[in-house]
Amino acid sequence: TALRSIGFARPARPVEEVPAAYAKKLKAQAAEHEGRAAATEEELKQCAPAREDLKLLSDYYRLRAQKYEALGEILQSEKTCMITGFIPKRDAKGLEEKLNSRFELAVESSDVPEDEEAPVLLSNGTFAASAEGVTASFGLPAKGEMDPTGIMAACYVFLFGLMLSDAAYGFIVFLMCFLALKKFPRMEENLRKSLRLFMYCGLSTLFWGVMFGGYFGDAVDIVSRTYFGHTVTIPALWFVPLNDPMKLLVYSMLFGVIHLFLGLGLKGYMLLKDGKVVDFICDVVLWYLLLLGLILMLLPTELFGSIAQMNIVFPPVLNSLAKGMAIVGALGILVMSARDKKNPILRLALGAYDLYNITGWVSDVLSYSRLLALGLATGVIASVINQMGSMVGNNVFGVIVFILVFCFGHLFNLAINLLGAYVHTCRLQYVEFFGKFYEGGGKAFRPFKQITKYVEIKED
C-alpha cells in the first residue's frame, strides 16, 4: 500500500530478467526477424524471371484440383461412368451434339420434374446483369418467382444517385470504375459486374448533381469568391436541396410511393401469371384502392400543404371518389384478407390484423426520407470542407492549405457517403421493395468449367 501510494505498480507480466536487458533481447530478436524478412525479399526478387512460369503452374494445379473435385462426385466403375447434372435448356442440344461427336456414349435430357428444385442461372442484359450481385446477396429467385434484377437495377441506380447527388463525385466514381474495367479486362466476373454497376451509379450521381447544382458541394462559389474576388455560381437545373429541403422530402416520399407501388404491381403480375385472379384482386387491387384513396385524401389537407408548401384543391367529386376508394379497399381487405378461413369471427379478426398493416406502409414510405438525409449530408459536409479550406485566406499559404483540405476532405466525404449510399440503397431494395413481392431462396447454378486466374485458355 505504501509503495502504491507513491506510484509503484506490479508489472503486468513479471519477468525474471532486468527490464532493460529483456528489452534489449527483444530488440535483438526483432532485428533478426527483420534480417530474415529482407533476405526472403531478396530471394523473391531473384525469382522474378520465373514469375510467368509460376503463374502457369498455379493455374495448372488449380485446374487439376477442379477436375478431381468433380470426379469425386461422379458415379463410376472400372469401365463406365454416369454423369448427371443441370444445363440451361437453350444449351442442351449443343452439348448433346458436341458429346456425341467426341465420345461413345448415351445422352438423355429431360425437363426438371415439378417436385425438384432446379438451380438458378440469371440471364440479363448488360445493364441488368451488373446488379445480379445485389439480387444474389438477398437470395436468388425461388421456383415460380420472377427475376427482379432488371427492374431493381433501374431503381437501384436511380436511388443511389439521388442519395450521393454531387456531379463531381459522380464523375469521379464513373471515371474510376470505367478505367478499372478497361485496365483489368481479366478481373473476376462478379467484381466486373459490381464495378459496372457503380459506373452506372456514378452516371446517376452526375445527373442528380447537375439537377441539384452540386459540384464538390459549393466549391465553385467559394473558390471564385475567395481567390478571384467575385462569385461564380453554376445554377441548378431543378433546385438546391440545401435551400429547399422540404421540397426534396416531398419528392423523396413520392419516389418511395412509386417504388413501393411498383413492388405491389409486380406481386400482382406474378399472381396473374399463375392464374390466381381472386388473389390478385384481394391482395393487390384492394390495397391499391385503399392506398390511393388515402393519398388523395391527404393531398388537399393543411398538414400536407404545410409540409409541401403548396396548396392542392380537388373538386368535390374527386374528394368523394377518394373516400369511396379508401372505404371499399378497407372493407374488402377486412372481409377477404383471410378468405381461406371458414370461421367468420376468425376471418374478420385476421382481416383487421392485415388492415393494421397500413402502418407498415406508412413506415415504409417514411423510410425514403433517407434520400433527403443522405443527399443533404453529402452537400453539407462538402460545403463545410470548402469553408474550412478557405479560412486561411487568399495567399500562397492559404492556397496550399485549401488544396490539402480540399483533397483529403472530399476524399473522406466521397468514401463515407459512397458507403452510406450503397448500404441504404440496398436496404430500400431488400426491405421495402422486395418485401412487397419477392422472397428468394433459390440455389445458384454452378457449372463445371475451367476457372483460371492468370492464364486465358482458348479452344480451336
Map each language-model feature to its residues:
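Long, charged N-terminal accessory/stalk domains
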Residues: 1-152, 180, 187, 191-195
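Conserved, carboxylate-rich catalytic/transport cores that coordinate ions
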Residues: 93-460
